[in-house]
Design a protein with these regions (language model features):
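Leucine-rich repeat
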Residues: 14-17
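S-adenosyl-L-methionine
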Residues: 1, 19, 23-44, 51-409
Length: 409
């Protein structure tokens, strides 16, 4: 009988923010299960290795929690050349239309996974919403004519009737996501597929692509929970993979995750926030005991974001340019555009989140440890530290998931 050694995904790694090695281990396990080989986990023969590549924490038992529903979404699908470069978008935003309405209604900033892990490509998108008719869309002259010329020929032969018949609209405009985001000043985004599990803020005017998962919350506490080691481990084990990169999906990673009591998506479904003196945002109307934990998480998360932003866009190398003011408006609805100062273009181009997490400087690790400690405190865990085994964290989270799943039956 042959043996195959498999790296235990529950063992702490030198770089816990990367999961590439674990994906390779999973493939080794699959090959072993398809043969007569006996599997050794970290050098020891084990009776059972679960589908999530652990010997004693069976996360395949984790259930979707109703308290998490309706908050995280895979974003829009284009199915056509709806995207345009920033220079063209800004020109269109200054153009009049025969019905007197602004192109800002249908020309929006756009972001995909690359814009998150690298730098924003200054791509915009034409978006005629979820139910705008062809007759209603056509007076937005330049955007409509672009779509008619570049999208309609491709869509006319599409086998799916909704794509073919509604060629001027995005193939999957995700109305539930739009409804959940309505009225928020910002939202949380993470790449579907990435080397590192990163969460960032995106301005409300940005339309996200399907290579991003969007969470409809504007408070720093929720971002901190999602960016904690606890959620990262959970999402790595319960997510899938694309080649050597972990994939994040709302159904497996988000909807199963047992948020701290009082800070679940159901608890914060009202989406209202309260600003702390330092500018951090927490969910409004929290009970005192929960509020203390929310404040700690929010402050730690805001500190991380502030440090990252300063590294990505150092003021010595970059400058903020006022964004375009669309025709008919008195001020720009968009945040200032960050560009490199003359002579620093190459240096700024290297300042990406992927490069930052590859470097993982001490200040970044410390900022994440502060988030982890604050989130663990919200669970009542006083022993959380970088030395706490991954398997122990997952065991506790699974127990909480199963407890809540049983209560919702």
């Amino acid at each position: 009988m042959a043996w195959v050694a498999v790296e235990d995904r529950s063992a702490p790694t030198a770089s816990p923010r990367s999961a590439v090695a674990s994906i390779g281990a999973l493939q080794a396990l699959r090959e072993a299960k398809d043969s007569s080989q006996t599997v050794a986990l970290d050098g020891a023969c084990v009776a059972t290795i679960h589908a999530d590549l652990t010997a004693d924490v069976d996360l395949t038992k984790a259930a979707k929690l109703r308290s998490n529903a309706g908050s995280a979404f895979v974003a829009t699908v284009k199915a056509g050349s709806f995207d345009i470069v920033g220079e063209r978008a800004r020109a269109w935003l200054r153009e009049p239309n025969p019905h007197g309405r602004s192109n800002a209604e249908v020309v929006k900033r756009w972001a995909n996974g690359m814009d998150m892990s690298r730098r924003w490509s200054d791509t915009w998108i034409i978006d005629f919403g979820v139910d705008m008719t062809e007759r209603e869309a056509s007076p937005f002259t330049l955007p409509f004519e672009h779509v008619r010329a570049h999208v309609k020929p491709l869509r006319s032969s599409n086998k799916r009737a909704s794509y073919r018949d509604n060629w001027w609209r995005l193939a999957e405009p995700i109305p539930k996501m739009r409804k959940a985001l309505a009225g928020l000043p910002r939202f949380i985004a993470t790449p579907v597929v990435a080397k590192f599990r990163l969460f960032v803020w995106m301005h409300a005017d940005v339309l996200a692509d399907h290579q991003l998962v969007v969470t409809a919350r504007a408070d720093d506490a929720t971002l901190g929970i999602l960016h904690s080691r606890l959620h990262e481990l959970w999402s790595l084990r319960l997510g899938t993979s694309l080649e050597d990169r972990p994939r994040y999906t709302p159904t497996t990673c988000f909807e199963t995750f047992p948020f701290p009591a009082g800070l679940t998506p159901a608890d914060t479904a009202h989406q209202r926030t309260e600003a702390l003196p330092d500018g951090a945002q927490i969910p409004a109307e929290l009970q005192p005991a929960v509020r203390a934990h929310a404040e700690a998480i929010a402050r730690a998360a805001k500190h991380l974001v502030d440090l990252r932003d300063a590294w990505l866009n150092p003021p010595e190398w970059t400058e903020a340019l006022p964004e375009v003011v669309p025709l008919g408006m008195n001020s720009s609805p968009y945040p200032d555009r960050i560009v490199a100062r003359a002579g620093f273009e190459k240096e700024v181009a290297k300042r990406t989140l992927t490069n930052l997490y590859n470097l993982r400087p001490a200040w970044l690790a410390q900022a994440h440890e502060a988030i982890d400690a604050a989130v663990a405190g919200a669970y009542g865990w006083m022993d959380e530290s970088p030395a706490l085994p991954d398997d122990e964290i997952l065991r506790r989270l699974l127990a909480l998931n199963l407890e809540r799943a049983a209560a919702q039956r």
